[in-house]
Amino acid sequence: MAFLIDLLYTIVIFNKLSIENWHKRTLMRKEIDLNTWDRKEHFEFFSRNATPHYCVAFNVDVTNLLHFTRTNKLSFYYSLVYLCTQTVNEIDAFLMETEDNKVYAIDQRIASFIDLAKGSTVFHVVCLPQQQDIFAFCSQAREQSTNNPLTLQQSCQITDPKVIFSCLPWLDMTTCTNERDYTDAKLKDDTAPIIVWGKYIQKDGKFTLNMTLDVNHRLIDGYHVGQFAQKLQNIIDSLC
């Protein structure tokens, strides 16, 4: 009995320290001068809305990614999370957040994605910063998901800027909406992009999937969504 108590205590302390370590991370955050920002008018216009979010659906050719992950024995899901996070972190418009009508530039967003333990139908959360390469990310994602998964509440305690991911691999998804707390007075400061995709399907010798990107119009326009889609496709096509 004493052994079980000690074990449970160790698990609780380990999880507590894991969460606390996130708060110790130091990320660059620099306020943007709105008077010299070329999107000042757009920011102020869309700031009038309590919920300035919108969602765009588009198709992604994942043929090369599927071949790459099968050849290298990597998780397709973790790999696509990595590539999407990489893409987000290469576009300036996605590296901004707001607070009290101020805009800040940040240096990166971390991936926050759901996962399922084998045999379970109840998802947990994994939060992971960008790693040195796709192999390191997939390895670390597997380790975190297996040995140190986060509850929904724990993931909310991690204050690092995020890219939020979900996946519906059971159906050929065409689009989706995302839950939001419309009673939250600070909802318009929610600037975390939300990326969701469905299962990939084969047609005419290619594998494609539908992806949705949910963003905040105070910071991100359709042009930037187009940048994301094209850049992601280019990165996938360049895998070898």
State each model region's role.
Residues 117-176:
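Helical lid/core segments from catalytic subdomains that handle acyl or acyl-like groups
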Residues 189-240:
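Active-site-proximal acidic secondary-structure segment that organizes catalysis
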